[in-house]
Amino acid sequence: MPVNFFATIFQTLLRNKEKELIRWPAEEGSSKNYTGHELLEKIGAIRMALLNQHITPSQPVLLAVPVSIDLICALLAIQAIGAVPVLPPAKAGAGGLLKVIRDRKIRFVVIARSPNLLRRTAAWMKNFKFIMIHGLPEVHQEILVTDVPPAQPALVSHSSGSTGAAKAVYRSHAVLLAQHQVLKETFPPWPDQVDFPLFPNILLHNLAAGTTSVLPDIPRFELSKVDPAVIAGQLIREGIHTLTGNVYYFKKLLAYFEQHALYFLCVQAIGIGGSPVPELLALSLKKIFPRATIFIIYGSSEAEPIAVRMVGDEPVHPLAGYKVGTVSKHIQLALAPAGEVVVAGKRYPVGEITIKGPHVAISTGTEALGTGDFGYLDEHNELCLTARKGNELICKGLQHYQLEQALMQDQRVERAAAIVRKDGFHLYVQGNIGEQEISNILKKWIDISVIKSISKRNRIPVDQRHLSKILYNKVR
Protein backbone atom coordinates (compact mmCIF):
# COMPACT_ATOMS: atom_id res chain seq x y z
CA MET A 1 0.00 0.00 0.00
CA PRO A 2 1.54 3.37 -1.01
CA VAL A 3 2.56 5.70 1.84
CA ASN A 4 4.55 8.87 2.50
CA PHE A 5 6.12 9.72 5.87
CA PHE A 6 5.55 13.42 5.19
CA ALA A 7 1.78 12.79 5.10
CA THR A 8 1.85 12.28 8.88
CA ILE A 9 3.64 15.59 9.41
CA PHE A 10 1.39 17.30 6.86
CA GLN A 11 -1.78 16.27 8.70
CA THR A 12 -0.28 17.42 12.02
CA LEU A 13 0.60 20.82 10.54
CA LEU A 14 -2.95 21.18 9.21
CA ARG A 15 -4.37 20.42 12.67
CA ASN A 16 -1.98 22.85 14.36
CA LYS A 17 -1.96 25.86 12.03
CA GLU A 18 -1.93 28.38 14.89
CA LYS A 19 0.38 26.47 17.24
CA GLU A 20 4.07 27.33 17.49
CA LEU A 21 5.78 24.09 16.52
CA ILE A 22 9.37 25.28 16.05
CA ARG A 23 11.31 28.01 17.84
CA TRP A 24 14.55 28.58 15.96
CA PRO A 25 17.39 30.59 17.56
CA ALA A 26 17.79 34.14 16.26
CA GLU A 27 20.09 36.99 17.23
CA GLU A 28 20.83 38.16 20.78
CA GLY A 29 18.98 35.46 22.67
CA SER A 30 15.74 35.73 20.71
CA SER A 31 14.03 33.14 18.55
CA LYS A 32 12.04 33.00 15.34
CA ASN A 33 8.83 31.08 15.94
CA TYR A 34 7.06 29.04 13.27
CA THR A 35 3.44 27.96 13.46
CA GLY A 36 1.99 25.06 11.55
CA HIS A 37 0.65 27.54 8.98
CA GLU A 38 4.04 29.21 8.48
CA LEU A 39 5.77 25.86 8.06
CA LEU A 40 3.20 24.82 5.47
CA GLU A 41 3.87 28.04 3.55
CA LYS A 42 7.63 27.48 3.49
CA ILE A 43 7.28 23.82 2.54
CA GLY A 44 4.78 24.73 -0.17
CA ALA A 45 7.08 27.34 -1.71
CA ILE A 46 10.04 24.93 -1.83
CA ARG A 47 7.82 22.16 -3.15
CA MET A 48 6.80 24.37 -6.07
CA ALA A 49 10.44 25.27 -6.79
CA LEU A 50 11.24 21.55 -6.96
CA LEU A 51 8.29 20.78 -9.23
CA ASN A 52 9.32 23.61 -11.55
CA GLN A 53 12.54 21.68 -12.14
CA HIS A 54 10.51 18.58 -13.07
CA ILE A 55 11.93 16.50 -10.22
CA THR A 56 10.16 13.15 -10.20
CA PRO A 57 9.27 10.63 -7.47
CA SER A 58 12.18 8.45 -6.29
CA GLN A 59 14.74 10.92 -7.69
CA PRO A 60 17.56 11.73 -5.20
CA VAL A 61 18.06 15.40 -4.25
CA LEU A 62 21.13 16.51 -2.27
CA LEU A 63 20.59 18.97 0.59
CA ALA A 64 23.68 21.21 0.69
CA VAL A 65 22.04 23.64 3.11
CA PRO A 66 23.36 24.61 6.57
CA VAL A 67 21.31 23.41 9.53
CA SER A 68 18.39 25.84 9.50
CA ILE A 69 14.64 26.07 9.13
CA ASP A 70 15.28 26.12 5.36
CA LEU A 71 16.97 22.71 5.62
CA ILE A 72 14.06 21.17 7.55
CA CYS A 73 11.43 22.58 5.18
CA ALA A 74 13.42 21.56 2.09
CA LEU A 75 13.75 18.00 3.39
CA LEU A 76 9.98 17.82 3.94
CA ALA A 77 9.22 19.40 0.55
CA ILE A 78 11.38 16.79 -1.18
CA GLN A 79 9.50 14.04 0.66
CA ALA A 80 6.17 15.67 -0.25
CA ILE A 81 6.79 15.20 -3.99
CA GLY A 82 7.97 11.63 -3.48
CA ALA A 83 11.63 12.38 -4.17
CA VAL A 84 14.49 11.28 -1.90
CA PRO A 85 16.32 13.83 0.31
CA VAL A 86 20.04 13.06 0.70
CA LEU A 87 22.02 14.53 3.61
CA PRO A 88 25.83 14.68 3.22
CA PRO A 89 28.23 13.25 5.83
CA ALA A 90 29.04 15.46 8.82
CA LYS A 91 31.45 18.28 7.95
CA ALA A 92 31.70 17.16 4.33
CA GLY A 93 33.73 19.65 2.29
CA ALA A 94 33.45 20.34 -1.43
CA GLY A 95 35.18 17.06 -2.24
CA GLY A 96 32.81 15.13 0.00
CA LEU A 97 29.76 16.72 -1.61
CA LEU A 98 31.03 15.93 -5.11
CA LYS A 99 31.61 12.32 -4.06
CA VAL A 100 28.00 12.03 -2.87
CA ILE A 101 26.80 13.60 -6.13
CA ARG A 102 28.83 11.11 -8.16
CA ASP A 103 28.01 8.02 -6.08
CA ARG A 104 24.26 8.72 -5.87
CA LYS A 105 23.98 10.00 -9.47
CA ILE A 106 22.44 13.24 -8.23
CA ARG A 107 21.22 15.82 -10.74
CA PHE A 108 19.76 18.40 -8.34
CA VAL A 109 21.38 20.07 -5.32
CA VAL A 110 19.38 22.29 -2.98
CA ILE A 111 21.30 25.30 -1.65
CA ALA A 112 20.25 28.33 0.37
CA ARG A 113 21.61 31.18 -1.75
CA SER A 114 23.06 31.88 -5.19
CA PRO A 115 26.19 29.78 -5.91
CA ASN A 116 29.56 31.38 -6.57
CA LEU A 117 31.50 30.93 -9.80
CA LEU A 118 33.42 27.91 -8.53
CA ARG A 119 30.20 26.10 -7.59
CA ARG A 120 28.56 26.98 -10.90
CA THR A 121 31.59 25.64 -12.76
CA ALA A 122 31.48 22.40 -10.76
CA ALA A 123 27.76 22.03 -11.51
CA TRP A 124 28.39 22.48 -15.23
CA MET A 125 31.27 20.00 -15.26
CA LYS A 126 29.47 17.35 -13.20
CA ASN A 127 26.09 17.84 -14.90
CA PHE A 128 23.95 18.79 -11.92
CA LYS A 129 21.79 21.81 -11.20
CA PHE A 130 21.40 24.05 -8.14
CA ILE A 131 18.00 24.94 -6.69
CA MET A 132 18.03 28.03 -4.44
CA ILE A 133 15.39 28.04 -1.71
CA HIS A 134 16.03 31.01 0.58
CA GLY A 135 13.45 33.78 0.36
CA LEU A 136 11.16 32.11 -2.15
CA PRO A 137 7.85 33.91 -2.80
CA GLU A 138 4.69 32.58 -1.19
CA VAL A 139 2.73 30.02 -3.16
CA HIS A 140 -1.02 30.00 -2.66
CA GLN A 141 -1.58 26.45 -3.75
CA GLU A 142 -2.66 23.35 -1.87
CA ILE A 143 0.14 20.93 -1.02
CA LEU A 144 -0.47 17.56 -2.61
CA VAL A 145 1.42 14.66 -1.06
CA THR A 146 2.72 12.05 -3.50
CA ASP A 147 2.32 8.47 -2.29
CA VAL A 148 5.26 6.16 -2.89
CA PRO A 149 6.06 2.47 -2.27
CA PRO A 150 6.66 1.83 1.48
CA ALA A 151 10.17 0.50 0.79
CA GLN A 152 11.28 3.62 -1.13
CA PRO A 153 13.93 5.63 0.76
CA ALA A 154 12.40 8.58 2.60
CA LEU A 155 15.78 9.86 3.78
CA VAL A 156 19.41 9.08 2.99
CA SER A 157 21.83 10.13 5.71
CA HIS A 158 25.30 8.99 6.77
CA SER A 159 26.63 7.20 9.82
CA SER A 160 29.12 8.80 12.20
CA GLY A 161 32.00 6.74 10.80
CA SER A 162 33.06 5.36 14.19
CA THR A 163 34.17 2.07 12.61
CA GLY A 164 35.66 3.57 9.45
CA ALA A 165 34.35 5.77 6.65
CA ALA A 166 30.84 7.19 7.05
CA LYS A 167 28.37 4.91 5.26
CA ALA A 168 25.08 5.84 3.63
CA VAL A 169 21.99 4.90 5.64
CA TYR A 170 18.73 4.44 3.72
CA ARG A 171 15.55 4.81 5.79
CA SER A 172 12.36 3.99 3.95
CA HIS A 173 9.00 5.67 4.45
CA ALA A 174 7.81 2.53 6.26
CA VAL A 175 10.84 2.60 8.60
CA LEU A 176 10.47 6.32 9.42
CA LEU A 177 6.78 5.83 10.17
CA ALA A 178 7.58 2.85 12.39
CA GLN A 179 10.35 4.77 14.21
CA HIS A 180 7.91 7.61 14.87
CA GLN A 181 5.32 5.20 16.30
CA VAL A 182 7.87 3.44 18.53
CA LEU A 183 9.21 6.76 19.88
CA LYS A 184 5.65 7.94 20.50
CA GLU A 185 4.87 4.70 22.34
CA THR A 186 8.10 4.74 24.37
CA PHE A 187 7.97 8.44 25.26
CA PRO A 188 4.30 9.51 25.03
CA PRO A 189 4.01 13.24 24.24
CA TRP A 190 1.72 15.41 26.34
CA PRO A 191 -0.24 18.58 25.55
CA ASP A 192 1.85 21.76 25.64
CA GLN A 193 5.12 19.81 25.98
CA VAL A 194 8.17 21.87 25.04
CA ASP A 195 11.09 19.75 23.83
CA PHE A 196 14.73 20.75 23.30
CA PRO A 197 16.06 18.29 20.68
CA LEU A 198 19.69 18.04 19.65
CA PHE A 199 19.08 15.19 17.19
CA PRO A 200 17.38 15.96 13.82
CA ASN A 201 15.35 12.73 13.87
CA ILE A 202 13.70 13.88 17.11
CA LEU A 203 12.75 17.19 15.48
CA LEU A 204 10.99 15.28 12.67
CA HIS A 205 9.32 13.04 15.25
CA ASN A 206 8.12 16.11 17.18
CA LEU A 207 6.63 17.62 14.03
CA ALA A 208 4.74 14.40 13.38
CA ALA A 209 3.51 14.34 17.00
CA GLY A 210 2.61 18.03 17.18
CA THR A 211 5.14 18.72 19.95
CA THR A 212 6.79 22.14 20.16
CA SER A 213 10.55 22.02 19.50
CA VAL A 214 12.99 24.68 20.71
CA LEU A 215 16.30 24.34 18.89
CA PRO A 216 19.51 24.77 20.93
CA ASP A 217 21.29 28.04 20.14
CA ILE A 218 24.56 26.59 18.81
CA PRO A 219 26.49 28.61 16.18
CA ARG A 220 26.02 26.95 12.76
CA PHE A 221 24.88 23.95 14.78
CA GLU A 222 28.53 22.90 15.23
CA LEU A 223 28.49 20.98 18.49
CA SER A 224 32.04 22.00 19.40
CA LYS A 225 30.83 25.62 19.63
CA VAL A 226 28.09 24.99 22.20
CA ASP A 227 28.04 27.66 24.95
CA PRO A 228 26.53 26.22 28.17
CA ALA A 229 25.66 29.72 29.42
CA VAL A 230 23.50 30.29 26.33
CA ILE A 231 21.85 26.88 26.73
CA ALA A 232 21.12 27.63 30.40
CA GLY A 233 19.38 30.83 29.36
CA GLN A 234 17.25 28.95 26.85
CA LEU A 235 16.25 26.26 29.35
CA ILE A 236 15.00 28.93 31.74
CA ARG A 237 13.52 31.38 29.24
CA GLU A 238 11.71 28.79 27.10
CA GLY A 239 10.39 26.65 29.96
CA ILE A 240 11.87 23.43 28.58
CA HIS A 241 10.21 20.19 29.74
CA THR A 242 12.30 17.58 27.94
CA LEU A 243 15.68 17.50 26.23
CA THR A 244 17.86 15.07 24.36
CA GLY A 245 21.55 15.09 23.56
CA ASN A 246 24.78 13.15 23.46
CA VAL A 247 27.66 12.60 25.86
CA TYR A 248 29.81 15.53 24.67
CA TYR A 249 26.85 17.92 24.91
CA PHE A 250 25.76 16.90 28.40
CA LYS A 251 29.34 16.81 29.71
CA LYS A 252 29.82 20.41 28.59
CA LEU A 253 26.54 21.48 30.17
CA LEU A 254 27.18 19.55 33.38
CA ALA A 255 30.62 21.10 33.97
CA TYR A 256 29.25 24.62 33.59
CA PHE A 257 26.06 24.02 35.57
CA GLU A 258 28.02 22.47 38.47
CA GLN A 259 30.56 25.31 38.44
CA HIS A 260 27.78 27.92 38.67
CA ALA A 261 25.53 25.93 41.03
CA LEU A 262 22.68 25.89 38.50
CA TYR A 263 19.78 23.48 38.62
CA PHE A 264 16.56 23.28 36.63
CA LEU A 265 13.20 22.35 38.12
CA CYS A 266 11.17 22.71 34.91
CA VAL A 267 12.87 19.79 33.13
CA GLN A 268 10.94 16.54 33.53
CA ALA A 269 12.84 14.09 31.32
CA ILE A 270 16.26 13.79 29.68
CA GLY A 271 17.36 11.36 26.97
CA ILE A 272 21.07 10.64 26.41
CA GLY A 273 22.30 8.71 23.39
CA GLY A 274 24.50 8.80 20.32
CA SER A 275 27.34 6.84 21.95
CA PRO A 276 28.06 4.77 25.06
CA VAL A 277 26.95 6.76 28.13
CA PRO A 278 29.23 6.81 31.22
CA GLU A 279 27.30 5.88 34.36
CA LEU A 280 28.79 8.80 36.29
CA LEU A 281 27.42 11.29 33.76
CA ALA A 282 23.88 9.91 33.97
CA LEU A 283 23.90 9.96 37.78
CA SER A 284 25.41 13.47 37.93
CA LEU A 285 22.65 14.88 35.71
CA LYS A 286 20.08 13.81 38.31
CA LYS A 287 21.52 16.43 40.68
CA ILE A 288 21.25 19.25 38.13
CA PHE A 289 17.77 18.22 37.00
CA PRO A 290 16.27 16.95 40.29
CA ARG A 291 12.75 16.48 38.92
CA ALA A 292 13.80 14.81 35.69
CA THR A 293 13.76 11.14 34.80
CA ILE A 294 17.04 10.27 33.07
CA PHE A 295 16.87 7.83 30.15
CA ILE A 296 19.77 6.20 28.34
CA ILE A 297 18.65 5.60 24.75
CA TYR A 298 20.53 3.04 22.67
CA GLY A 299 19.99 3.20 18.95
CA SER A 300 21.75 3.66 15.64
CA SER A 301 21.27 5.56 12.42
CA GLU A 302 19.34 2.54 11.15
CA ALA A 303 17.16 1.93 14.23
CA GLU A 304 15.95 4.30 16.93
CA PRO A 305 15.43 3.16 19.63
CA ILE A 306 16.87 -0.33 20.12
CA ALA A 307 16.80 -0.28 23.91
CA VAL A 308 15.96 2.23 26.65
CA ARG A 309 17.01 2.33 30.30
CA MET A 310 15.59 4.52 33.04
CA VAL A 311 18.54 5.41 35.27
CA GLY A 312 18.08 4.60 38.95
CA ASP A 313 19.87 6.06 41.96
CA GLU A 314 22.42 3.26 42.26
CA PRO A 315 25.20 2.77 39.71
CA VAL A 316 25.61 -0.54 37.91
CA HIS A 317 28.67 -2.72 38.51
CA PRO A 318 31.76 -1.00 37.04
CA LEU A 319 32.59 -4.04 34.89
CA ALA A 320 29.05 -4.47 33.55
CA GLY A 321 29.90 -2.42 30.48
CA TYR A 322 27.43 0.19 29.29
CA LYS A 323 23.99 -0.89 30.48
CA VAL A 324 21.39 0.31 27.96
CA GLY A 325 18.32 -1.40 29.37
CA THR A 326 15.24 -3.09 28.01
CA VAL A 327 15.14 -3.99 24.34
CA SER A 328 12.17 -2.55 22.43
CA LYS A 329 9.35 -5.07 22.09
CA HIS A 330 9.32 -4.29 18.37
CA ILE A 331 12.95 -5.44 17.98
CA GLN A 332 14.05 -9.01 17.38
CA LEU A 333 17.54 -9.15 18.87
CA ALA A 334 20.15 -11.88 18.58
CA LEU A 335 23.77 -12.19 19.66
CA ALA A 336 26.23 -13.70 17.18
CA PRO A 337 28.26 -15.88 19.61
CA ALA A 338 31.76 -14.59 20.35
CA GLY A 339 32.55 -16.08 23.77
CA GLU A 340 31.90 -15.12 27.39
CA VAL A 341 32.56 -12.10 29.58
CA VAL A 342 32.79 -12.09 33.36
CA VAL A 343 30.99 -9.56 35.59
CA ALA A 344 31.20 -9.88 39.38
CA GLY A 345 32.09 -13.56 39.06
CA LYS A 346 29.20 -14.35 36.69
CA ARG A 347 29.71 -15.47 33.11
CA TYR A 348 27.55 -14.16 30.27
CA PRO A 349 27.48 -15.24 26.61
CA VAL A 350 28.51 -12.25 24.52
CA GLY A 351 28.31 -11.50 20.82
CA GLU A 352 27.67 -8.94 18.12
CA ILE A 353 24.18 -7.48 18.47
CA THR A 354 22.04 -8.10 15.40
CA ILE A 355 18.51 -6.77 15.09
CA LYS A 356 15.48 -6.73 12.84
CA GLY A 357 12.01 -5.27 13.09
CA PRO A 358 9.63 -2.78 11.47
CA HIS A 359 11.66 0.27 12.54
CA VAL A 360 15.04 -1.17 11.50
CA ALA A 361 16.58 -0.11 8.17
CA ILE A 362 18.11 -3.26 6.70
CA SER A 363 20.13 -3.36 3.48
CA THR A 364 18.65 -5.24 0.55
CA GLY A 365 19.69 -8.88 0.59
CA THR A 366 20.37 -9.08 4.34
CA GLU A 367 18.11 -10.61 6.98
CA ALA A 368 19.21 -8.52 9.97
CA LEU A 369 21.23 -5.44 10.85
CA GLY A 370 24.62 -5.99 12.42
CA THR A 371 25.00 -3.04 14.79
CA GLY A 372 28.77 -3.29 15.17
CA ASP A 373 28.27 -3.40 18.95
CA PHE A 374 28.97 -6.42 21.14
CA GLY A 375 27.09 -7.14 24.32
CA TYR A 376 25.13 -9.53 26.53
CA LEU A 377 21.74 -9.82 28.22
CA ASP A 378 21.98 -9.89 32.03
CA GLU A 379 19.83 -11.86 34.48
CA HIS A 380 17.11 -9.19 34.21
CA ASN A 381 17.16 -9.49 30.40
CA GLU A 382 18.64 -6.01 30.11
CA LEU A 383 21.16 -5.30 27.37
CA CYS A 384 24.73 -4.32 28.25
CA LEU A 385 27.32 -3.19 25.69
CA THR A 386 30.85 -4.55 26.05
CA ALA A 387 32.77 -3.79 22.83
CA ARG A 388 32.84 -2.13 19.42
CA LYS A 389 33.57 -4.10 16.26
CA GLY A 390 37.24 -4.01 15.36
CA ASN A 391 38.26 -3.99 19.02
CA GLU A 392 36.15 -6.89 20.26
CA LEU A 393 38.76 -9.48 21.27
CA ILE A 394 37.97 -11.05 24.66
CA CYS A 395 40.92 -11.19 27.07
CA LYS A 396 40.52 -13.05 30.38
CA GLY A 397 36.76 -12.60 30.33
CA LEU A 398 36.91 -8.89 29.56
CA GLN A 399 36.12 -6.63 26.63
CA HIS A 400 37.23 -3.04 26.26
CA TYR A 401 33.99 -1.22 27.17
CA GLN A 402 34.08 -2.93 30.58
CA LEU A 403 37.46 -1.39 31.39
CA GLU A 404 36.50 1.99 29.97
CA GLN A 405 33.27 2.17 31.97
CA ALA A 406 35.17 1.25 35.15
CA LEU A 407 37.66 4.07 34.53
CA MET A 408 34.93 6.58 33.65
CA GLN A 409 33.51 6.17 37.17
CA ASP A 410 36.30 8.56 38.22
CA GLN A 411 35.47 12.16 37.34
CA ARG A 412 39.12 12.92 36.57
CA VAL A 413 38.95 10.63 33.53
CA GLU A 414 37.59 12.56 30.53
CA ARG A 415 37.93 9.73 28.01
CA ALA A 416 39.39 6.24 28.07
CA ALA A 417 40.21 3.86 25.22
CA ALA A 418 41.25 0.28 25.92
CA ILE A 419 42.86 -1.19 22.82
CA VAL A 420 42.98 -4.98 22.98
CA ARG A 421 45.78 -7.01 21.45
CA LYS A 422 46.75 -10.66 21.82
CA ASP A 423 48.91 -9.90 24.85
CA GLY A 424 46.26 -7.88 26.71
CA PHE A 425 44.87 -4.35 26.97
CA HIS A 426 46.70 -1.13 26.22
CA LEU A 427 45.04 1.85 27.89
CA TYR A 428 44.95 5.41 26.58
CA VAL A 429 43.52 7.96 29.00
CA GLN A 430 42.62 11.63 28.62
CA GLY A 431 42.20 13.58 31.85
CA ASN A 432 43.86 15.00 34.93
CA ILE A 433 44.93 11.69 36.43
CA GLY A 434 48.23 9.85 36.75
CA GLU A 435 49.14 6.40 35.47
CA GLN A 436 49.46 4.92 38.96
CA GLU A 437 46.04 6.27 39.91
CA ILE A 438 44.59 4.68 36.78
CA SER A 439 46.15 1.37 37.75
CA ASN A 440 44.78 1.67 41.30
CA ILE A 441 41.21 2.16 40.02
CA LEU A 442 41.35 -1.02 37.95
CA LYS A 443 43.02 -3.10 40.68
CA LYS A 444 39.76 -2.95 42.61
CA TRP A 445 37.98 -4.92 39.89
CA ILE A 446 40.39 -6.92 37.73
CA ASP A 447 43.64 -8.85 37.65
CA ILE A 448 45.90 -5.94 36.70
CA SER A 449 48.23 -8.26 34.77
CA VAL A 450 45.79 -8.04 31.85
CA ILE A 451 46.83 -4.38 31.44
CA LYS A 452 50.01 -4.25 29.38
CA SER A 453 50.47 -0.48 29.13
CA ILE A 454 48.95 2.80 30.32
CA SER A 455 49.47 5.96 28.27
CA LYS A 456 48.23 9.50 28.86
CA ARG A 457 46.93 11.46 25.88
CA ASN A 458 45.97 15.13 25.53
CA ARG A 459 43.23 14.14 23.12
CA ILE A 460 41.66 10.84 22.17
CA PRO A 461 40.17 11.00 18.63
CA VAL A 462 36.37 10.97 18.32
CA ASP A 463 33.82 11.09 15.49
CA GLN A 464 32.93 14.37 13.75
CA ARG A 465 29.18 14.20 14.33
CA HIS A 466 28.64 13.33 17.99
CA LEU A 467 32.16 14.23 19.23
CA SER A 468 31.56 11.33 21.60
CA LYS A 469 32.34 8.06 19.79
CA ILE A 470 35.97 7.04 20.11
CA LEU A 471 37.71 6.25 16.81
CA TYR A 472 39.61 3.21 18.02
CA ASN A 473 41.41 2.71 14.72
CA LYS A 474 43.01 6.15 15.16
CA VAL A 475 44.07 5.81 18.80
CA ARG A 476 47.86 5.88 19.03
Say what each PLM segment does.
Residues 177-194, 199-241:
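Conserved AMP-binding/adenylation subdomain of ANL enzymes
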Residues 33-37, 154-181, 212:
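Conserved AMP-binding A3 loop
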Residues 283-297, 301-382, 389-391:
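Conserved AMP-binding/adenylate-forming
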